[in-house]
């Protein structure tokens, strides 16, 4: 029986490249001359710390970072940015988290979405991924389109497609 896995992963090497590109752009921009503005990628926590001297500049830095992530093939919805910007001394910062894996609430929404579609497929939750099996390849491709089209708040990839 054909099957595939639905996963949500961020390539950390591409994220590192995007952070480096964003840092290079900030160094060359006129509006950030003489301003302490940095990006720090923490591989262990899978977070990106955006630091600057004002909250407005932090928002500008986040826009630059999102653009660079998108150019490297990482969707903006994979970056979980908290609403509040932390003020510490003379700097403002925000620590954005890269979404890795599918949370259980989102997994349940995906399984419910697949079951409500009345396609002849089965969806099983396996850790941080979902295995979808069915008799027809066309049904599996319909499920892929359904998951891509559903507004679930994070990007998904499809792996281990087997016939």
From Swiss-Prot:
Residues forming coiled coils: none
The keyword Ribonucleoprotein belongs to this UniProt entry's keyword annotation: no
InterPro entries linked: DUF520, UPF0234-like_C, UPF0234_N, YajQ-like_sf
Listed GO MF terms: nucleotide binding
The keyword Lyase appears for this protein: no
Keyword vocabulary terms for this entry: Nucleotide-binding
Gene Ontology CC terms: cytosol
Family per record: Belongs to the YajQ family.
Physiological role: Nucleotide-binding protein.
PANTHER family with a match to the protein in the record: UPF0234 PROTEIN YAJQ
Designated name of the protein: Nucleotide-binding protein KPK_4305
Protein species of origin: Klebsiella pneumoniae (strain 342)
